[in-house]
Amino acid sequence: MIFGYARVSTDDQNLSLQIDALTHYGIDKLFQEKVTGAKKDRPQLEEMINLLREGDSVVIYKLDRISRSTKHLIELSELFEELSVNFISIQDNVDTSTSMGRFFFRVMASLAELERDIIIERTNSGLKAARVRGKKGGRPSKGKLSIDLALKMYDSKEYSIRQILDASKLSKTTFYRYLNKRNA
């Protein structure tokens, strides 16, 4: 099945040009919406994706009509590849059923992987530099006073667990972790 997807960003824009091009291409089913590209909630796109099966094709007028960012476009292309769905952009001359179209998207996927690796390297470098400066990652410790208070309240058997947690500002998990550690 050949699915067409058309989108405009504002109410002032018109879907006619896209719909005409998609109809001329020979789509079987059209999905259209009027939402900004930055908006994550795109029900028509989601509905189309849920209907996709192996061997189907997704046809768009231009790449910027389906994707709000390069990252999102790469995510979609990876999804289409996983589903064995062809992806065609009429204006951009992209067709993943051809070797050049597949190459184009593999380059995009490689760039996405490179970007992810760079982010990981930067994060690890930042954490290492922080450790060298004496900074410690993770959540701040709950403090001995809170823990001691909670355990004393528990030992008194005068308070419910809820009252102990509220007074000590400890989570249930943290409280029981310290209680079990003490009783071990």
UniProtKB/Swiss-Prot annotation:
Domain Resolvase/invertase-type recombinase catalytic positions: 1-134
Protein keywords: DNA integration, DNA recombination, DNA-binding, Plasmid, Transposable element
Protein's UniProt name: Transposon Tn917 resolvase
Family: Belongs to the site-specific recombinase resolvase family.
GO MF terms, alphabetically ordered: DNA binding; DNA strand exchange activity
Residue ranges of the annotated DNA-binding region, renumbered to this chain: 161-180
GO biological process, one term: DNA integration
Function, as annotated: Resolvase catalyzes the resolution (a site-specific recombination) of the cointegrated replicon to yield the final transposition products.
